[in-house]
């Protein structure tokens, strides 16, 4: 299930829900996944509460503790919009990239601890699902460009 906190131009809950189903199957994730697309402020609050990091982030994943559910994913529409602009693709595509990234975390992958396994799998699934470059491959580039733009 996809929950958009606000209307986003060119983004359809139904289309993202269909993609979520494809991403879950591709990653081997069973059970329901809920995706909340919301503000950077809300992601910052979630990040502070659950990871003790007082900063906004693009995507967070929360594995489920209830049978029949895989977990929840929260995505910042603000950061996704910045990434999409910087990388020259649509917001819808960026949300799909972030959904795939979150689903891989729900499947138990962790790019902060593994030795490139998640990056390789994300790249493979990105190609299979016809998405632009993966989140892991490009994480620092958009953030640096956005920071430069804000300083001007």
Curated annotation (Swiss-Prot):
Chain's role: Single strand-specific metallo-endoribonuclease involved in late-stage 70S ribosome quality control and in maturation of the 3' terminus of the 16S rRNA.
Subcellular location: Cytoplasm
Binding site for Zn(2+): 101, 105, 111
A GO CC term assigned to this protein in UniProt: cytoplasm
Entry-linked NCBIfam families: rRNA maturation RNase YbeY
Keywords noted in UniProt: Cytoplasm, Endonuclease, Hydrolase, Metal-binding, Nuclease, Ribosome biogenesis, rRNA processing, Zinc
Cofactor note: Binds 1 zinc ion.
Spans annotated as Disordered: 132-152
The name this protein goes by in its record: Endoribonuclease YbeY
Organism: Koribacter versatilis (strain Ellin345)
Membership in a protein family: Belongs to the endoribonuclease YbeY family.
This enzyme's EC code(s): 3.1.-.-
Gene Ontology terms: biological process: rRNA processing
Listed cofactors: Zn(2+)
Compositional bias of kind Basic residues: 141-152
MF terms (GO), sorted A to Z: metalloendopeptidase activity; RNA endonuclease activity; zinc ion binding
Signal peptide range: none
Xref: Pfam families: YbeY (PF02130)
């Amino acid at each position: 299930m996809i929950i958009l906190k606000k209307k986003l131009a060119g983004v359809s809950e139904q289309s993202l829900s269909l993609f979520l189903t494809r991403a879950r199957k591709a990653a081997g994730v069973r059970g329901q996944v809920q995706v909340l697309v919301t503000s950077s402020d809300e992601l910052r609050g979630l990040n502070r509460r659950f990871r003790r990091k007082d900063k906004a982030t693009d995507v967070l994943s929360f594995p489920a503790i209830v049978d029949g559910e895989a977990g929840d994913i929260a995505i910042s529409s603000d950061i996704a919009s910045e990434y999409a602009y910087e990388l020259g693709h649509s917001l819808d595509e960026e949300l799909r990239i972030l959904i795939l990234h979150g689903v891989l975390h729900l499947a138990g992958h962790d790019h902060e601890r593994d030795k490139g396994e998640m990056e390789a799998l994300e790249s493979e699934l990105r190609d299979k699902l016809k998405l632009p470059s993966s989140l892991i491959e490009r994480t620092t580039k958009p953030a640096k460009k956005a920071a430069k733009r804000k300083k001007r």
